[in-house]
Regions:
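A compact, surface-exposed functional segment
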Residues: 241-260
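Short hydrophobic alpha-helical segments that form membrane-spanning helices or hydrophobic packing faces
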Residues: 5, 23-24, 232-241
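N-terminal membrane-proximal hinge/A-helix region immediately C-terminal to the signal-anchor transmembrane segment
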Residues: 1-47, 51-60, 79-87, 170-173
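A glycine-/small-polar-enriched, mobile loop at the entrance of the PLP active site in fold-type I
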Residues: 49, 71, 75
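Cytochrome P450 heme-thiolate monooxygenase catalytic core
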Residues: 33-39, 75-236, 252-255
Length: 260
């Protein structure tokens, strides 16, 4: 383990099993995720959530999200995810050979899973209004937000750079988009499915008795959208590549899922 100074901040590099244990299992007195990540994530997610709040508040917000990750909801999501994947394969240009009768097709699996992750997440966790508005303009906002995750923003998050201007504009527009959904639901103009994360968050209160406000919900929804995209895409891609290397177990795994 060693420490060096970068742009006036001390940076500690922790290597090996002991280093991993310090990073992932360290006490709050030893490590602070908020101090490490807030300059990178707060401009993207928005204020008042995740690493822009004390750890105790973050733990409560994690509890709010966990309430929406119920077994009941997951059972509902299975059919929705299946429908999205089938529709994607039947209509996306990447699978044109299959649509024309070919028995196989070659695709960039990571690109495909990146798209599928957005489609399935918006259909399930994000809610029907998000899925219905998932067009090119929404994709552009997502791209501009995602571009805000650049290394320089760890230490200098507000440099007058074009990608930061686009990030800030996209954050405001995305936040207002979610606020509009929440407002219509509270006014009874639209109904959620009851199984998405917006529905779950709208019912939550902090331990002190304060209800979570609509802006916090909007920013938590942005965090959910952004935070899970890369890991889910990478994990899905890895799983598919492993299956491709072991074709003899594909049918066995499929039958297992059918039984479940």
């Amino acid at each position: 383990r060693f420490t060096f100074t970068l742009f006036g901040r001390n940076m500690t590099v922790a290597l090996g099993p002991k280093g991993s244990n310090l990073v992932f299992n360290g006490r709050l007195s030893q490590v602070s995720a908020e101090d490490a990540y807030t300059s990178l994530t707060t401009p993207v997610f928005g204020k008042g959530v995740v690493y822009d709040v004390p750890n105790a508040v973050l733990m409560e917000q994690k509890r709010f999200v966990k309430s929406g990750l119920s077994v009941e909801n997951f059972r509902v999501y299975v059919t929705q995810i299946t429908d999205e994947v089938k529709d994607f394969v039947q209509h996306d240009a990447a699978f044109a050979p299959l649509q024309k009768g070919a028995k196989s097709v070659t695709v960039d699996i990571f690109d495909v899973f990146s798209e599928i992750t957005i489609l399935t997440a918006s259909r399930t966790l994000q809610g029907k209004e998000v899925r219905e508005n998932l067009d090119k303009s929404f994709a552009k906002l997502y791209h501009d937000l995602d571009a805000g995750f650049t290394p320089i923003n760890f230490v200098l998050p507000n440099l007058p750079l074009p990608n930061n201007f686009r990030r800030d504009r996209a954050q405001r527009m995305m936040s207002d988009f979610y606020m509009g959904i929440i407002k219509k639901r509270r006014e009874g103009k639209t109904d959620g499915t009851g199984h998405d994360m917006i529905s779950a968050l709208m019912e939550q209160s902090y331990k002190g008795g304060r209800d979570i406000n609509d802006r916090e919900i909007a920013h938590m929804m942005i965090a959910l959208l952004m935070a899970g995209q890369h890991t889910s895409s990478a994990t899905g891609s890895w799983a598919m590549l492993r299956l491709a290397s072991r074709p003899e177990i594909i049918e066995e795994l499929y039958e297992e899922q059918v039984r479940v």
